[in-house]
Each structure stands twice: as C-alpha cells, then as structure tokens.
C-alpha cells in the first residue's frame, strides 16, 4: 500500500505539469482528492489495516494528501493569474487613439414610470411623501388591521430583522403613518391626499414575473366626505392618463385587510383593443392594481373617528406598469444594469 501511495503522488505530479487551464485543474482535483479518488479510498480503508502498519500508512497517506492539496492550490493561483493577464491583454486600450463621442446617460425606465405617475397625481393636489424601508411591525401590520398572528399576514412573506422590525412589505406603511399624523392634528377640517413610492421586500422566489425586491406606489385620501364614486373617478383618470388612451376600467370585488370594500382594478386591453391577445390572456382585460375604501378598523387603529372621516387607498406595482407599457417580458431586466437594455428608453426620458 505504501508503494501504491507513492505511485499516486508521482502520477499526480506528472499530470499536474500537463494542466493548462482551470477546467483541467478541476478534473485533476476530482481525480486525486475527490470522494471517489484512490487516495480517498485508501484513507477510508485505514481502519481495516492491521495495527502495526496502520500508523505508518495513515501518516504517509495524510502527508501525500496535504502535499497534493498544496500543489493544487499553488497551481490554481498560477492559472488564475495567467487567465487574468490574458483578459487584461484583450481589454487593453490604446490611449493614443482618437476619442469617440461621449455617450450620455438617461433615466432608468422605472424612474420614467414613477415620474409619470407622480405628475398625474401632483397635478390634482396629491403630495409626495417618503418613508423608511425598515419599518416597525406596528406600522407595517398592526395599524393596518393585521394584528399579531393573524392569518392574513400569510399573504405577505416577510423578512424580519428582529421581533419588532421588518423590511416593509408594502408602501402602505406610509398610510398608517400619515393617518396617525392626521389624527394628531385633532381638528376636523384637515384632510389628507398623499402619494408614496419605494422599494418593498417579500420572500418571493425570483423568476420572470416575481422578485424579492420590487417597487410600488401607494395613494391615500382621507377627509370628511369622500366616497367610492371619488375612488372610481380617480382610478379611471389615472388609467387614461397613464396608458394614453380612452380605456375603460372594470372593478372586481376582492379582499385587502386595510380596505373595505376592496376591488381589483382591470383596464380594457390597450394592446389589442379588447379583442383578446396573449397580454390579456384572451379576456380583453388586464389586471393592474388593487384599491378600496379605508377599513373603519384602520381608521380607529390610527386614532380617527370613522363617523367623521372616510378614506380611499390604492396601490400599484411600478415594474408591472413598466412591463405593460414597454412590452418587457422579464422583471429581472430592470435590475441587471444592462446598458443595451436600458438605453432603449432614452427617447422616453428626453
């Protein structure tokens, strides 16, 4: 067995000299110290060897394994340096060449959509507000009619930083903060009309239409005499401005813990004029957002009297709107920093 070990080491040294790239290095590593290698088999069989030779063979086998690992690491470093030099040589720039025209940047496609939506609502009196992405459980859940251990929380897989702090799962956390601020004014003639946007986080598996991080817009209005009719008008106004067509909207009953009644908002398909296509899945309608009247329990939890105040709220995913407006099929395109993809939208940002 000692001869076999020495033969393994000699064979390794010969083959190591022939290694020219990292792929063949990986194969050599697997051959000599992988789980199915001859050396590993010998190490596993040492316990079956007679005691008088066990120590000698075990010591030699481990010494050879350490030597092989050290030489592999040294060879790997050499190969990496070699590949780096080749790469640097290929990317070498002749600084004496005449400079080409400068390329100017442009707005990110998501910022284009955000600014378009913001302009629509600031024109009709909404105020922009912003908040923190790390939020307390109180404002992210409890003040939005999602008490501790309530099953409705399962609708949003959440990243917890500790028992009290989370990465916000929606921009609706600003709804509870602004309602609480309105209640603190303690006057009946105050009203609220705000819009907020930003990153939110959920434990979704990333794929073509889902991401663990995405952007949303949230709107909230709250004053003495506001009704579902006002909500419907605002929704239709926004959709017609956003998609630049005289489209129709459809409201379907739904459920959200912080609104009652709640609706899903569909728009008539602006890609096929409601005739049926792959975008609208042959239905003629595209779902774009959720909305509703603020639940009276939410008003109470934030210190407002539901007999004096009513409110409306709705939210929309920025990436979803961008995907619909610009025919983008994969949400990951927004975050890969691919200049060739992003510069397509330069025209829209000018």
Curated annotation (Swiss-Prot):
One Pfam family named in its UniProt record: tRNA-synt_2d
Cofactor(s) listed: Mg(2+)
Top-level EC class: ligase
GO MF, one example: ATP binding
Source taxon at top rank: Bacteria
Keywords: Aminoacyl-tRNA synthetase, ATP-binding, Cytoplasm, Ligase, Magnesium, Metal-binding, Nucleotide-binding, Protein biosynthesis
E.C. code: 6.1.1.20
Subcellular location field: Cytoplasm
Segments passing through the bilayer: none
Keyword check for Ligase: yes
GO cellular component, one term: cytoplasm
Cofactor remark: Binds 2 magnesium ions per tetramer.
Biological processes, Gene Ontology terms: phenylalanyl-tRNA aminoacylation
Reaction(s) the record says it catalyses: tRNA(Phe) + L-phenylalanine + ATP = L-phenylalanyl-tRNA(Phe) + AMP + diphosphate + H(+)
InterPro entries to which the protein is assigned, alphabetical: aa-tRNA-synth_II/BPL/LPL (IPR045864), Phe-tRNA-synth_IIc_asu (IPR004529), Phe-tRNA_ligase_II_N (IPR004188), Phe_tRNA_ligase_alpha1_bac (IPR022911), Phenylalanyl-tRNA_Synthase (IPR002319), tRNA-bd_arm (IPR010978)
Keyword Kinase applies: no
Binding site for Mg(2+): 260
Assembly mode: Tetramer of two alpha and two beta subunits.
Family the entry assigns: Belongs to the class-II aminoacyl-tRNA synthetase family. Phe-tRNA synthetase alpha subunit type 1 subfamily.
Protein name: Phenylalanine--tRNA ligase alpha subunit
Name of the gene: pheS
């Amino acid at each position: 067995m000692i001869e076999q070990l020495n033969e393994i080491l000699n064979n390794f040294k010969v083959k190591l000299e022939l290694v020219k790239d990292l792929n063949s290095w990986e194969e050599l590593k697997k051959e000599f110290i992988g789980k199915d290698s001859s050396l590993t088999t010998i190490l596993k069989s040492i316990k079956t060897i007679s005691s008088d030779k066990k120590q000698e063979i075990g010591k030699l086998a481990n010494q050879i394994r350490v030597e092989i690992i050290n030489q592999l690491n040294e060879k790997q470093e050499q190969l990496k340096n070699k590949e780096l030099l080749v790469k640097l040589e290929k990317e070498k720039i002749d600084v004496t060449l005449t400079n080409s025209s400068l390329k100017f940047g442009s707005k990110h496609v998501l910022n284009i959509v955000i600014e378009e939506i913001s302009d629509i609502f600031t024109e009709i009196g909404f105020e922009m507000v912003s908040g923190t992405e790390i939020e307390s459980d109180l404002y992210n859940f409890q003040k939005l009619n999602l008490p501790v251990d309530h099953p409705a929380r399962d609708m949003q897989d959440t990243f917890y930083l500790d028992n009290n702090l989370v990465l916000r799962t929606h921009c609706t956390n600003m709804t509870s903060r602004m309602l609480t601020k309105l209640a603190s004014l303690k006057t009946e003639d105050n009203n609220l009309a705000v819009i907020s946007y930003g990153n939110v986080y959920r434990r979704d598996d990333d794929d073509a239409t889902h991401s663990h991080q995405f952007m949303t817009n949230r709107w909230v209005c709250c004053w003495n005499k506001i009704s579902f009719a006002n909500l419907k008008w605002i929704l239709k106004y926004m959709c017609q401005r956003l998609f630049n067509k005289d489209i129709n909207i459809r409201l379907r009953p739904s459920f959200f813990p912080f609104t009652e009644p709640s609706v899903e908002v569909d728009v008539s398909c602006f890609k096929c004029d409601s005739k049926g296509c792959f975008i609208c899945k042959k239905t003629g309608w595209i779902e774009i957002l959720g909305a509703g009247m603020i639940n009276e329990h939410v008003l109470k939890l934030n210190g407002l009297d539901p007999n004096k105040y009513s409110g409306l709220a709705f939210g929309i995913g920025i990436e979803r709107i961008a995907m619909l407006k610009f025919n983008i099929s994969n949400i990951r395109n927004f975050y890969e920093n691919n200049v060739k993809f992003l510069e397509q939208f330069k025209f829209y940002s000018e």
